[in-house]
Regions:
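A cross-kingdom feature that marks ATP-driven nucleic-acid transaction machinery
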Residues: 300-459
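Phosphate-binding site recognition
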Residues: 1-334
């Protein structure tokens, strides 16, 4: 199975593996984001002796036995006997005095549950062998809150972790590596549904159309990913009904706290705040404010950041009764097709364009690097309306306005001029304009205006 992307994280792990002395690494991120595959791929690319152990939700004795078997297989000697996990780990720290070694404890929170004082055990071993052992210990886990707690001052391991990798979903560009044969337009559509989770993207069948992949994987009864979102939520949140209500309201386009409270049917404001806080910690929802008014709570809003969750709650969860009694193609045509093309994908395209600009900014390819990117809140005195520009960057010279259009016709000169005039009416200190178009342009770029075709995003 081919491995895609994650170049920076692989380089970080290789530096850790090649360090002369002891190193402690922490890798965490949401389920399915590719932590284990990243580690396994990095281990395949190093000559350092390694043991990869997936901790189990059993007992200390069972985990100790299983790790002992791995130890024997790695070093080709009879299975040793250890009466505790501490004794086994002590043996490995000792062994790494003679020869560097990598030990990966994947799903570390499971081990932490069954071994009393596990963090303290590791702390004592790290302190004892810090100057003499060359063990590279990697702790990995999907329970983000638990893994982050290892870095807190009150935790025994505080100050002992040498490298931390908070693994995020891939962006649109790395995700497209999983489906290279699709057109650029279809890459946008696929990312809009399956996002940057490697597990989802590996399931995409290049022999099928985008529509067929969606039906096959998420929009039909018993589809491979039909229960993926709800199962993930249930594993993290006890009051799943409240989470479902909030997600459905967000998927319908409500983003302000007051709107969510009135449209989600969550019983109270504290209950809503609790659900939103948990969803934000799970990194499937985020709170964002306009870059020109970041401290104004009234203008802040919440959005779903996990694309599969957004698609699921907008179409599958909302119309599940219809989906279960209809032909899948008829269901898609009636409840998904038009809204998907006219509303859903164009909104997701804006996020793809933001990611493109961040990639360009990090690579030093923009004329002036920006400090912030986000929405811009405006008042239009001529029409006496207010609203938000979806993609604006801020740098020392002022603001740059971007307009993303995922439409089947080229952008014309008059459309571009209309957008520029609207920006100027707001009084925004905008010194440059750029337009990103799925279908190209029937226009010429004037001074201070950049025209970016879709194919440039995938170069």
């Amino acid at each position: 199975m081919k491995f895609y992307g994650r170049e920076k994280q692989r380089k970080d792990l290789h530096r850790l593996f090649l360090y002369e002395g002891m190193q402690i690494g922490l890798i965490y991120g949401r389920r399915r984001v590719g932590k284990s595959e990243l580690i396994k791929q990095s281990l395949r690319e190093t000559d350092v002796t390694s043991i990869y152990f997936e901790c189990k939700q059993t007992t200390e004795q069972n985990n100790t036995e299983s790790l002992s078997v791995l130890l024997a297989d790695t070093f080709h000697f009879p299975k040793p006997s250890f009466d505790s996990m501490e004794a086994l780990l002590t043996y490995l720290f000792e062994a790494a005095k003679e020869k560097p070694m990598i030990l990966v404890l994947d799903e570390y929170p499971y081990l932490r549950e069954v071994v009393q004082g596990m963090d303290s055990v590791l702390q004592a071993l790290v302190d004892r062998y810090r100057d003499t052992s060359a063990l590279k210990l990697i702790l990995c886990g999907s329970y983000v809150d638990v893994m982050k707690s290892l870095l807190l001052r009150e935790n025994p391991l505080y100050g002992r972790v040498d490298r931390t990798i908070d693994l995020k979903p891939m962006d649109y560009y790395e995700s497209a590596m999983f489906y290279p044969t699709f057109s650029d337009e279809d890459k946008v559509r696929l990312y809009s549904v399956f996002g940057g989770i490697p597990y989802y993207n590996r399931l995409i069948n290049s022999q099928l159309s985008v529509r067929e992949n969606i039906i096959e994987l998420i929009a039909s009864p018993d589809a491979r990913l039909e229960n993926e979102v709800s199962m993930y939520l249930k594993s993290e949140i006890s009051k799943i009904n409240n989470a479902n209500e909030v997600f459905e309201a967000l998927a319908r386009g409500f983003s302000k706290y007051s709107d969510l409270l009135s449209h989600s049917h969550v019983s109270s404001s504290p209950a809503l705040a609790d659900v939103l806080e948990k969803l934000i910690r799970m990194e499937v929802v985020k709170k964002e404010a306009p870059i020109n008014d970041v401290n104004n709570k009234r203008k802040a809003g919440y959005i779903i950041t996990d694309n599969l969750s957004l698609f699921y709650y907008r179409y599958v969860f909302r119309y599940s009764s219809q989906m279960n009694v209809m032909d899948s193609d008829v269901f898609y045509d009636r409840y998904i097709r038009d809204d998907f093309e006219k509303q859903y994908v164009p909104r997701q395209f804006e996020e793809i364009c933001r990611q493109y600009l961040i990639r360009q900014n990090r690579a030093g390819k923009l004329p002036i690097p920006f400090d912030r990117i986000g929405k811009y809140y405006y008042d239009d005195p001529q029409t006496r309306t207010n609203g938000e520009f979806d993609i604006v960057t801020e740098d020392p010279n002022g603001y740059v306005f971007y307009e993303a259009k995922f439409r089947s016709e080229p952008l014309t000169q008059s459309m571009i001029q209309q957008e520029i005039e609207q920006v100027r009416r707001t009084g925004m200190n905008c010194y440059r304009y750029a337009f990103i178009s799925r279908s190209g342009f029937d226009a010429q770029a004037d001074e201070g205006v950049e025209l970016i075709p879709l194919e440039k995003l995938y170069e």
